[in-house]
Amino acid sequence: MKVLWLVSITIPAAADACGLQAKEIGGGWLSGALGGMTAAPDAPAITVASVDARAETLTVCSKNGVSFALVPTGSVENFSALLKKIAPDLVHIWGTEYAAARTIQQAAQAAGIPVLVGIQGVMVDCALHLNDGVPARLLHSCAAQHLIDRHVPGGLLDVNQARFDTLAQSEAAVLANARHVTGRTSFDRSAVQKLAPQASYYLCNETLRPEFYTPPVWHPRTFGEAPVLLLSQGNYPLKNLHTVLKALPAVLAQYPGAVLRVAGWPPLDKGPLLRPV
């Protein structure tokens, strides 16, 4: 069986196989899932596909028994050419939160290839609650901020809101045309029932990053010790760093040694224009 697995980023293994520099910090769970699948004795033949503008044309590379495909844009034409070249038995769309999900779905359906859609985040709800708790005065950017953002892309809230709204519409189209959908949570299932009532739903829990399965072994903290709070991302308001900061004084009042660690996009790496932000 041959599976074409569309993911939202070019994972490090794909960049390495195709002679590109790995540019993504995230996506460790994708690499972990790929390693787990390829290690299985009955693993299908997998081609991991992504949209990457650094690939001027359709590019297919192989390394360690895995194929990787890069398309320069997520157009129906590019994905149609990819499907013709790979001839997969199944297309697995990992996530509905990016525009390429819809176009590869269209290309696969036109070619008569079954499609499995995996929910990674329900964009319609993310868009609805993206800026919850953010003061209204911060939700609109001025012309100067938009000018700077064009040259030094940052995280303007109104720009992000427009992007999330667009992706929510694209996701709705994907799910409206889906016949098979996997999800992890009751929230996912509820969303699929509303957005894809015609689809068969499958519960599919996922792997964690490899670090969770290798030494040193992690153990829950001893009750009463000062906690270490981890926020997986703080670079956009959906993750609610602003809410955590409001609650932090109450936490510190009870646990003076508590520590908050924030992962994700570091503004200091974005150059001097964004450092004062």
Language-model segments: residues:
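Active-site proximal beta-strand in glycosyltransferases
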Residues: 2-6, 90, 109-153, 202-205
